[in-house]
């Protein structure tokens, strides 16, 4: 087999390459002809050029002796213009070719389907997300080690990698006065991802200060740095953008400065269908991938060291299943021989979002975003005793119900997850919901249920990987606590919008508005929410990193159990949800796993 790339030592483009250099040269350097790599060999193949894929590719190819091929279904989109570059255009690109728009199954909650927005292009969902930069609670990350058996996956280590990825700018005096707070000890300043305050240049709205005053009267903290491991209360937050307000996406930061490395190649417009496995040894070994655009025209490329799956929490489990790695019951249904029986595609955990919006008076005009990370008790308010009663009496029942619905495979193991969540909420006051405030022309809250107890799944439904036929069922709100938690958080947002200092700027509610009486009960809210929510597009867990006996698909080095030379390195592997926007976690994951890969590479030489 021929070698695809030169391993000669050259000086790569500087990491500090100005971000405003657009695509001059890069698109011409990206491969589009599959025959350019077919039949050849590299050290590492990365299936997926999103956040984790490009971060890992950049880190591995710092060593000029390591050759890497990234295969991505989309194309280079970072210079598309305001639709990508402007965070204030969030949502406008949905429905375009840069959005996978995966469709769920018909949901049992409401007999409707939903679309899962996911970036299709180099950079993945960093092309289309809202760019919010926060970090989880320390105890959440610590539990990955203490509860799930992932040695080294604790707050101290993961936070260090997260800071390594970050190039933060402190807020200026105007931004601090508006409500930003910056703790230098919680930020990196020499990393790759540019992070700083969003600022259109307009005056900031007084509504954020009013919200802070309102919650302070409730005993809730304000103006905390949400990157320090204890997100709680109301604060403004930084975003992934440059000082000139251009989006800092993964392709712009990890590929654009490095695409001229002779040991890195990127093939676009191609799907990875399955992993090629050598089954002649006691343990199957990944030796390459099959890729293409349809089954009549496929190609193989080979990996000397490892195959790394980075196609996202919806697609990486599909690639495994098409490779014969998954639940035998699923693979038998589509006629694929089982090579390794693992609970692939289970433990899917996504959050939900509901809007509560009001008109504002002219005095409230101005820019600004903030978030209220609310604890379990703050979310439920007067309903907290009933909510605690559910936590204390229903965990076993919920686990059995989730297994019966196909969201997990072992009720005893799932109860361990639920007990971990209960510990977070009851003993550590981990944020349970997020009320995300945007003041662009309205008092617009979007409310998230951060810690879902429901479990869903993703499984292939056809043996042809290029048809991408699969069942994606997050099973939203099939757990009663999730539904009532979303209802309580939404009710809280309505109450805050017309309370205390916020009243000054309140000019009438538009959503739910007349669709839900102002004195609606929690049950009324719950019924309304079933038909008026959307997914949050933060699905995790479908190739969970945990002990095998707990339901793990990969170990603490992201290696697939029972297969040599194969890892999953993306959002499939977190075993839990977190009280945070997830980019900080995913960048840390990619860098930490990259170091594990490099250590294995060094030991092989």
Curated annotation (Swiss-Prot):
Superkingdom of source: Eukaryota
Annotated keywords: Cell wall, Cytoplasm, Disulfide bond, Extracellular matrix, FAD, Flavoprotein, Glycoprotein, Oxidoreductase, Secreted, Signal, Virulence
SS bond list: 186-228
Residues the record marks as active site: 538
Cofactor(s) it depends on: FAD
Residues that coordinate or bind FAD: 51-52, 72, 125, 129-130, 132, 272, 571, 583
Tagged with keyword Oxidoreductase: yes
Record EC number: 1.1.3.4
Subcellular location: Secreted; Secreted, Cell wall; Cytoplasm; Secreted, Extracellular space, Extracellular matrix
Database matches in InterPro entries: FAD/NAD-bd_sf, Glucose_Oxidase_domain_2, GMC_OxRdtase, GMC_OxRdtase_N, GMC_OxRtase_C
GO annotation, cellular component aspect: cytoplasm; extracellular region
Knockout-associated phenotype: Completely eliminates gluconic acid formation, both in vitro and in fruit. Results in a significant reduction of decay development in nectarines and grape berries. Decreases the expression of the ochratoxin biosynthesis genes.
Subunit structure, interactors included: Homodimer.
Family under the similarity heading: Belongs to the GMC oxidoreductase family.
Protein name: Glucose oxidase
Organism of origin: Aspergillus carbonarius (strain ITEM 5010)
Origin organism lineage: Eukaryota, Fungi, Dikarya, Ascomycota, Pezizomycotina
């Amino acid at each position: 087999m021929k070698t695809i790339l030169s391993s000669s030592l050259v000086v790569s483009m500087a990491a500090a390459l100005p971000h405003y250099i657009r695509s001059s040269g890069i698109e011409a350097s990206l491969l589009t002809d599959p025959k350019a790599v077919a039949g050849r060999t590299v050290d590492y193949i990365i299936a997926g050029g999103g956040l984790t894929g490009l971060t890992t590719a950049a880190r591995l190819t710092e060593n000029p002796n390591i050759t890497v091929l990234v295969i991505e279904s989309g194309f280079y989109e970072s210079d598309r213009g305001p639709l990508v570059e402007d965070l204030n255009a969030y949502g406008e690109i949905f429905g375009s070719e840069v959005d996978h728009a995966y469709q769920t199954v018909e949901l049992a909650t409401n007999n409707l389907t939903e679309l899962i927005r996911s970036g299709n292009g180099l950079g993945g969902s960093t092309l289309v997300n809202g760019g919010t930069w926060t970090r989880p609670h320390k105890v959440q990350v610590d539990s990955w080690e203490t509860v799930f058996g992932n040695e080294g996956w604790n707050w101290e280590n993961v936070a260090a990698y997260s800071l390594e990825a970050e190039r933060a700018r402190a807020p200026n005096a105007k931004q601090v006065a508006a409500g930003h707070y910056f703790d230098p000890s919680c930020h990196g300043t020499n990393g790759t991802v540019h992070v700083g305050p969003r600022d259109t240049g307009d005056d900031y709205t007084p509504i954020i200060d009013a919200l802070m005053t309102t919650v302070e009267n409730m005993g809730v903290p304000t103006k905390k740095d949400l990157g320090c491991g204890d997100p709680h209360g109301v604060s403004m937050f930084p975003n992934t953008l440059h000082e000139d307000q251009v989006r800092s996406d993964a392709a712009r930061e990890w590929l654009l400065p490095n695409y001229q490395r002779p040991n890195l190649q990127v093939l676009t417009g191609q799907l990875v269908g399955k992993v090629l496995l050598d089954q002649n040894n006691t343990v199957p070994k990944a030796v390459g991938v099959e890729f293409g655009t349809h089954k009549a025209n496929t190609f193989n490329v080979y990996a000397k060291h490892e195959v790394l799956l980075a196609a996202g929490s919806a697609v990486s489990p599909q690639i495994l299943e098409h490779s014969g790695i998954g639940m035998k019951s699923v693979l038998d249904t589509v006629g694929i021989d089982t090579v390794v029986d693992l609970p692939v595609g289970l433990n899917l955990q996504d959050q939900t979002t509901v809007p509560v919006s009001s008109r504002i008076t002219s005095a409230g005009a101005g820019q600004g975003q903030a978030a209220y990370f609310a604890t379990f008790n703050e979310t439920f308010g007067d309903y907290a005793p009933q909510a605690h009663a559910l936590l204390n009496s229903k965990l076993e029942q919920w686990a059995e119900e989730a297994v019966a619905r196909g969201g997990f495979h072992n009720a005893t193991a799932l109860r361990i997850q639920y007990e971990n969540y209960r510990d977070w909420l009851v003993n550590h006051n981990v944020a349970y919901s997020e009320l995300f405030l945007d003041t662009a022309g309205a008092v617009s809250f979007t409310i998230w249920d951060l810690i879902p107890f429901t479990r869903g799944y993703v499984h292939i439904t056809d043996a042809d990987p290029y048809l991408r036929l699969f069942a994606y069922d997050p099973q939203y709100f099939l757990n009663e606590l999730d539904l009532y938690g979303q209802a309580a958080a939404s009710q809280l947002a309505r109450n805050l919008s017309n309370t205390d200092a916020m009243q000054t700027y309140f000019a009438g509610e538009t959503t739910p508005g007349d669709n839900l009486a102002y004195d609606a009960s929690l049950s009324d809210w719950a019924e309304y929410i079933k038909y008026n929510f959307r997914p949050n597009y933060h699905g995790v867990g479908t190739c969970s990193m945990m002990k095998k006996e707990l339901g793990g698909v990969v170990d603490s080095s992201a290696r697939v159990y029972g297969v040599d030379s194969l890892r999953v390195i993306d959002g499939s592997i977190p075993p839990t949800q977190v009280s945070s926007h997830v980019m900080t976690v995913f960048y840390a994951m990619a860098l930490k796993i990259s170091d594990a890969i490099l250590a294995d590479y060094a030991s092989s030489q």
